[in-house]
Structures are given as C-alpha cells and as structure tokens.
Amino acid sequence: MSLNPSRPSSSELVELHVFYVPEGSWNYKLNTISIEVINNFISAGFIRVSPQLTLQALRERLGEFLGVDAVAEKFLFLKCIGNNLAVVKEKQESELKLKSFAPPYALQPELYLLPVIDHLGNVYSASTVTLDEQESINDTTEINGTIYRPDSVSLSKDEPGNPSLLENTWRDFTNQEEAEESQPTQNHFGNSKLLGSLEESNDYFGNLKSPFLWKNDDEEEDEEKDNAALSRRQATLVCDKECTALPDLIDFPSFPSQRVSSRLTDTSLLKIEREKIIEQMKQVKEERKYLENIREELIKKVDKLFEQNKSKRYHASDSWKKKYLDTKKVTASLEEVLTKLREDLELYYKKLLMQLEAREIKMRPRNLANISDSKNYLIIQITEVQHAIDQLKRKLDTDKMKLILEVKMRKQAVSDLQTLKADLTQKKMGAPFRPPMFSGSVPT
C-alpha cells in the first residue's frame, strides 16, 4: 500500500521493455533459447501497464501501446525460467500477470516476444503481410511432404472491384466454351442433356401434326411458328441459366492459367528451399566430419597420454619390486652372516659368564660376608643386563623393518587397487579414461 493516497494511479504502473527474438536465434529442436543471447534481441520499445494485467489482455492491447506496425500479427510470449526462455502456453496467458515479469519476481523488467514464422520463412506482421498473402498461406496445405493449393481459392478484396478484370475473365470463359463446343466430343453432360431435351421437344411437336391432317395450311404455319418460338424461348432460358451461373465462377480466381502459374511459383519456391536445405545438410555433414576427425585425434592423444602415464606408474612399481627383490637377495647372505655373528656373540657371552662365575666360586670362602658387594658379582650383573639390552635392540630393529615394509606394501596395494578399479570402470563405460594423479610418492 502506498503511504500517500493522493498519488496518481500512474505510480502503480510498471514499465516493461519489449524485445523480439531475431530470426534464426530460436532453437526449434529444443523449443527454447539461452538467456545469454538476450543481448542480441531486437527492441520494440517499452510499455507502461498495470502489474495486474494478464498476458491475454496485453495481447489484445499491445498494438495500442507500441503501434500496429511494431507488433507482429502472430507471436508467442516467453518467460525466463532458470537459464533459458520457455514458451507461455495459451492457457497460461490468462493466468500470468505482468508483475511476474518485473522485479522482484524477475531480474529485469523485460518482456520477450517470439514472432511466428510460416513454412516459407515469412514473418506474420501487420505491416508486411497483405490480405492476398494471408489467403494464399491459409489456403496452402502440405500433404505428404508436397504443397497442395485447392481450386476453390477466394479472390482478394481488390479483384472483384475491377471491371476490366471481370470482362477479361468473362471473355476468356466464353472463348473457352466456344472452343469446347467446336470439339467433336461432348464436354459437359448437362449441356448434352439440355440439347437432347430440345430435340425431343421438337420431335414431339413435329409428331403432333399427324392426328390433325384435316387442318388448314395456315394452322400448320401457325403451329410451326409457335414451335419455333417455344424452342427459342427454351434456348433463351438455357442461356439465361448459363449466364446466371457464370458470375458465380468469378468468385473462383483459380482459372487454369492462374492455377498453373501459382503451382509453378510454388514448385519453384519448393525447389529453391529444397536446394537450400540440401546445401545446408552438406555443410552440416562436412562440419560433422571435421569435428569427428578432431574428436578422433583428441581421443588418440588422450589414449597415448593415458598409456604413457600407465607405463610410468607400472615402470615405477616394477622398478621398486626389482629393487626389493635384489635387496632381498643381498640381505639373505647378510642375514646369514648376522646370525653367525650373533651365535658367536652368544658363545662369547656364555664363556665370559662361566669365567666370572668360576672366579666368584673361588673367591667365596675368603669373602663370604660381602658376596653381593664384590666386583665380580657386579660385573656379572652388568653383563647380563647389557646382553638383555642388546637383544631388545635387535628385536626392535627387526620389528621396525617389518612395519616399514608392511606400510610400503600396503600403499602399493592400495594404488594397484585404484588402478584396477579405474580400468574396470573404463571398460564398463567404453570411454577413454584419464587416470588420477596420486599425491603419494612411489615407495623406494
């Protein structure tokens, strides 16, 4: 609600900028167009209308706002839905109001119109389409891929008012009737029927003479005159009927010559359109071949890079395995030497311990009170503790080596598993695959 009730009603109006979709921009296959092409639309002006006005009411009054010449005769309203423009159906025009085309319901206060184009590429507009073109478009129907123009095409509004044209058509028709009558064959069943009726009437009136032979010659002459007058009257009636039926033919402009010329123009237009379509199809085929070649080259490059990356990864893993096996072979001999040295160390340790214990036994009778405080006993304890520490260190080193080896093997197994999964998905999808680059380094 406005705070100032005395403000004029024009403050409640909304201004909308009207745009036309240019020819060739609309995607008839998808029946939509992207909003990125809005900058190329043609401006038809702006309108100031009530936001409560529906599209159906605006269609009737759009010529008043923009002018008859600026408004197409047949057009469709478009509405921005997402990133594309969609066609507004006839039922939706009575429901949608103009406020939905202005902020805050829309990004911009703009109204988009799509002119309807006929099958010959002509845009229906009030300034360019004449009555004759509309009738020719309405009377031309397409059946099984060919254009058919019916014979009962009505004349344009300018033709009935032209007397010279009527005279010419009447003269052509009479000439045609005379030419048809000069032919030996009968062209019209109705005319032959009328001629037959005339002959039968003459025969009838001629046969009436036989029962009245006693009549005078004057009476016979009078009867002959009456018969001749009756035949003339019937002939005039037949001519009047034909003459009264002829003006109805004026309503049909598709005389043989006009029909042939119109069909020739239609066939020529169809040939031109067909040639254009064939050329466009050839261009599209060439572009498609070119794009397919580029696609094949790109696929080959991707496959080559994929193979190179795959070979690098496999080479790194193979080199690591080779190093591991080589070091394992070397360490086998070193482990044998180490075990021998450990056995020798154990022997030396046992000998030293035996010597110290023997010396301790010899020194016992002298110093029975201070056995625990003797140097020999302390040396024995130190030796045992040192031996235990050495064993713990060796065990710690072996456990550490096993742990490092297990971690490296697990990392390598995870990378191999991911590679196998990627190869499997690639085979299922049937498309070239670009493997992911792992951040972890190859174990050494």
Swiss-Prot record:
The cellular component terms of Gene Ontology attached to this UniProt record, alphabetical and capped at eight, are: acrosomal vesicle; cytoplasmic vesicle
Q: Does the keyword Mitochondrion apply?
A: no
UniProt entry keywords in alphabetical sequence: Coiled coil, Cytoplasmic vesicle
Localization terms from the record: Cytoplasmic vesicle, Secretory vesicle, Acrosome
- List where this protein forms a coiled coil: 268-403
Which Pfam families does this one have? SPATA1_C
| Organs and tissues of expression | Highly abundant in the testis, and is also expressed in the heart and kidney (at protein level).
Superkingdom of origin organism: Eukaryota
InterPro entries from the UniProt entry:
SPAT1, SPATA1_C
The record describes its quaternary structure and partners as: Interacts with IFT20.
> Can you name this protein?
Spermatogenesis-associated protein 1
The protein's organism comes out as Mus musculus
Lineage start: Eukaryota, Metazoa, Chordata, Craniata, Vertebrata
